[in-house]
Swiss-Prot record:
Residues annotated as binding NAD(+): 212-218
Protein's UniProt keywords contain Transferase: no
Organism, scientific name: Staphylococcus aureus (strain MRSA252)
EC numbers for this chain: 1.2.1.3
The protein's name: Putative aldehyde dehydrogenase AldA
Pfam family of the protein (one): Aldedh
NAD as UniProt keyword: yes
PANTHER family tied to this protein: ALDEHYDE DEHYDROGENASE B-RELATED
Active site (catalytic residues): 256, 290
CDD domains hit by this protein: ALDH_StaphAldA1
Length: 495
């Protein structure tokens, strides 16, 4: 299937600052390609420090009036954004598929609808938020107000470009902040097109979108004196740099980082449900998911039943053209990611690991122009193996046999990460006990990789700081002000 790219994507994009697309301070551009075909999709502006200065100044000026708008006004605008996203769902989903390589069935059903739902959700959250009043005694009253912080500086990863942007933009502007956000230089196109919706709905300067290299303009955003709050989704290595910038400037930061999550299959699991959940955990979005269930811990009593079923299921996955609605797995997002995956396959071959399924790049039937990789299942002897400890970020699943629930818990916790995990069991008490014992921010029971609004998402340990996607996330973008009132008119007599 082929589409006319220009029906969806412009040949060039400027920076979106103060409600319009503008030229950058430099003529430098970055080529944006389709990872499934190698074709050039567009060229984006390579922002420089001067452009960051401009965007932050505009956001500061817009904050003065935006922060004073009523909650109901902001809520209505967020709803309008969500409605317009859904009205253009098919177009934006195709842009996401063209630019990211993920299947159209995923972008149509998940990426864009869930982005829209986050705008609707935070419209309701801000509209129903209430302050508090505490009568400390008969003459004193304490009022608690939640006020916006100011200018938010955000950078999002390349694996869910539009959805991750919505996770940050929706609560930030709902709370009354303005934002300067930068998508990945490899997958910026969906957010740039959605800028046209912001242009229709929001006052100028509330949302500003820069494009460029993370090490250049992204770093400049995080280290700008005019930015009052940082928000980042990406690797743990870069997360450290963002945390350092936040500490240096004494501003708060929300960090959603890497993971190496354990998916635990107990001996009483519904195996049909487990096989589907395992695939959801590691094959969804080609395994390019921070919460991927990339360590499979299988009870020894069912290991010999489950593994052959997984081998068959993995071999039947349709990997191919992301625009084909029958495709279940598309292209990895780029050559660097493909090479990284291959390096782990090579490490497996040189060790005592056993490749049970997959393990190869796919190049037949026209796939040689993209970065397609087979669903891969690898048995490792224990959790200390390189493949069980390091985040691969691809459709590569390591499987480890466990003897009981406690060993599963111990192995699940034997990781520097703590983002997510799963438990499959028909005994809810048993599953809950494991869920409580595993030190991660999210545990799915009898499903995996569900990311709805209204449920907090974020990690323990080196997987991040803070939570997103639920009403408590609004507080990430607010400051608390206390107004303390003395109504007694009485002197205290101390001076």
């Amino acid at each position: 299937m082929a589409v006319n790219v220009r029906d969806y994507i412009a040949e060039n994009y400027g920076l979106f600052i103060n409600g319009e697309f503008v030229k950058g301070s430099s003529d430098e551009t970055i080529e944006v390609t389709n990872p499934a075909t190698g074709e050039t999709l567009s060229h984006i502006t390579r922002a420089k420090d001067k452009d960051v200065d401009h965007a932050v100044k505009v956001a500061q000026e817009a904050f003065e009036s935006w922060s004073l708008t009523s909650k109901s006004e902001r809520a209505q605008m967020l709803r309008d954004i969500g409605d317009k996203l859904m009205a253009q769902k098919d177009k934006i989903a195709m842009i996401e598929t063209l630019n990211n390589g993920k299947p159209i069935r995923e972008t149509t059903a998940i990426d864009i609808p869930f982005a829209a739902r986050h705008f609707h959700y935070f419209a309701s959250v801000i509209e129903t938020e209430e302050g508090t009043v505490n009568d400390i005694d008969k003459d004193t009253m304490s009022i608690v107000r939640h006020e916006p912080i100011g200018v938010v500086g955000a950078v999002v990863a390349w694996n869910f470009p539009m959805l991750l942007a919505a996770w940050k933009i929706a609560p930030a502007i709902a709370a009354g902040n303005t934002i300067v956000i930068q998508p990945s230089s490899s997958t910026p196109l969906s957010l740039l097109e959605v800028a046209k919706i912001f242009q229709e709905v929001l006052p100028n300067g509330v949302v500003n979108i820069l494009t460029g290299k993370g090490s250049e303009s992204g770093n400049a955003i995080f280290n700008h004196d005019g930015v009052d709050k940082l928000s980042f989704t990406g690797s743990t290595d870069v997360g450290y740099q963002v945390a350092e910038a936040a500490a240096k400037h004494l501003v708060p930061a929300t960090l959603e980082l890497g993971g190496k999550s354990a998916n635990i299959i107990l001996d009483d699991a519904n195996l049909d449900l487990a096989v589907e959940g395992i695939q959801l955990g590691i094959l969804f979005n080609q395994g390019e998911v921070c919460s991927a269930g990339s360590r499979l811990l299988v009870h020894e009593k069912i290991y010999d039943q489950l593994v052959p079923r997984l081998q068959e299921a993995f071999s039947n996955i349709k990997v191919g053209d992301p625009q084909d609605e029958a495709t279940q797995m598309g292209s990895q997002t780029g050559k660097d990611q493909l090479d990284k995956i291959q390096s782990y396959i090579d490490a497996a071959k040189e060790s005592d690991a056993q490749i049970l399924a997959g393990g190869h790049r796919l190049t037949e039937n026209g796939l040689d122009k993209g970065f397609f990789f087979e669903p891969t299942l690898i048995a490792v002897p224990d959790n200390h193996h390189k493949l069980a400890q390091e985040e691969i970020f691809g459709p590569v699943l390591t499987v480890i046999k466990v003897k009981d629930d406690q060993e599963a818990i111990d192995i699940a916790n034997d990781s520097e990460y703590g983002l997510a995990g799963g438990v499959f069991s028909q005994n809810i008490t048993r599953a809950l006990n494991i869920a409580k014992a595993v030190r991660t921010g999210r545990i799915w029971i009898n499903t995996y990789n569900q990311v709805p609004e209204g449920a907090p998402f974020g990690g323990y340990k080196k997987s991040g700081i803070g939570r997103e996607t639920y009403k408590g996330a609004l507080s990430n973008y607010q400051q608390v002000k206390n107004i303390y009132i003395d109504t007694s008119n009485a002197l205290k007599g101390l001076y």
